[in-house]
UniProtKB/Swiss-Prot annotation:
Sorted UniProt keywords: Nucleotidyltransferase, RNA-binding, rRNA processing, Transferase, tRNA processing, tRNA-binding
The keyword Transcription regulation is annotated on this UniProt entry: no
GO MF term set: 3'-5'-RNA exonuclease activity; tRNA binding; tRNA nucleotidyltransferase activity
Chain sites annotated for binding phosphate: R86, G124, T125, R126
Natural source organism: Dechloromonas aromatica (strain RCB)
Biological function: Phosphorolytic 3'-5' exoribonuclease that plays an important role in tRNA 3'-end maturation. Removes nucleotide residues following the 3'-CCA terminus of tRNAs; can also add nucleotides to the ends of RNA molecules by using nucleoside diphosphates as substrates, but this may not be physiologically important. Probably plays a role in initiation of 16S rRNA degradation (leading to ribosome degradation) during starvation.
Pfam families: RNase_PH (PF01138), RNase_PH_C (PF03725)
Protein name: Ribonuclease PH
Quaternary structure, from the entry: Homohexameric ring arranged as a trimer of dimers.
EC number of this enzyme: 2.7.7.56
């Protein structure tokens, strides 16, 4: 039995709240159980130097955790003067995931930065960040269309992410912190709404996992992503 009493294929309760803050072009609070992440999208009418004059835009991301997002306080990375390797890895993952579903040429020479700030962490923060940031990105692009700066929204498909793993010998969906810290296998799967795989990050924390187990986990993640895409659609329709 899982610590949360959930079924093996059961997501935590997902809530996506749009327009959570006032100033950003896209603003979303995503809650997956007790994990809460604020995702904002900021539009700049310029691109990084390596893209100037090339007729395309850019989407990038930054990720961070509030000092008391976890059980004990962690110092702000700004106070230390550098980001951890984990932070850099996660924000690159978020950026890659979002760029996989947007037409950068259709975006034009502008940059959209997604800031994902973890308010409370209970496992799956990078996955929640991707799922929430997609809604913020779509919202920001929609505002560009409404302002007459784009003829159509350049976001071509949904993208969402979910964790899966092997916990006490059984495959489970959407690991919370107690499961994440005690699982045999931990895997993050990023997929599009059409079912395309963007990225899989899988690690054996204990016993190595088999190819058959990996297939089961990817199937489980596919089920989870379908539910998350439905949650994204509901948020946009609200």
């Amino acid at each position: 039995m899982r610590p949360s009493q959930r079924q093996p294929d059961q997501l935590r309760t997902v809530r996506i709240t749009r327009n959570f803050t006032r100033h950003a072009e896209g603003s979303v609070l995503i809650e997956m159980g007790d994990t809460r992440v604020l995702c904002t999208a900021s539009v700049e009418e310029n691109v990084p130097p390596f893209l100037r004059g090339k007729g395309q835009g850019w989407v990038t991301a930054e990720y961070g955790m509030l000092p008391r997002a976890t059980h004990t306080r962690s110092s702000r990375e700004a106070a230390k003067g550098k980001q951890t390797g984990r932070t850099q890895e996660i924000q690159r993952l978020i950026g890659r995931a979002l760029r996989s579903v947007i037409d950068l040429k259709a975006l034009g020479e502008r940059q959209i930065t997604l800031d994902c700030d973890v308010l409370q962490a209970d496992g799956g923060t990078r996955c929640a960040s991707i799922t929430g940031a997609w809604v913020a990105l779509y919202e920001a692009c929609d505002k560009l269309v409404q302002a007459g700066k784009l003829p159509a929204n350049p976001v071509r498909d949904h993208v969402a992410a979910i964790s899966v793993g092997i916990y006490k010998g059984a495959p489970v969906l959407d690991l919370d912190y107690p499961e994440d810290s005690d699982c045999d296998t931990d895997m993050n799967v990023v997929m599009t709404g059409a079912g395309g795989i963007v990225e899989i990050q899988g690690t054996a924390e204990g016993e190595p996992f088999t190819r058959e187990q990996m297939s089961v986990l990817v199937d489980l993640a596919t089920l989870g992503v379908r539910h998350l895409v439905a949650a994204q659609q509901s948020a946009l329709a609200a």
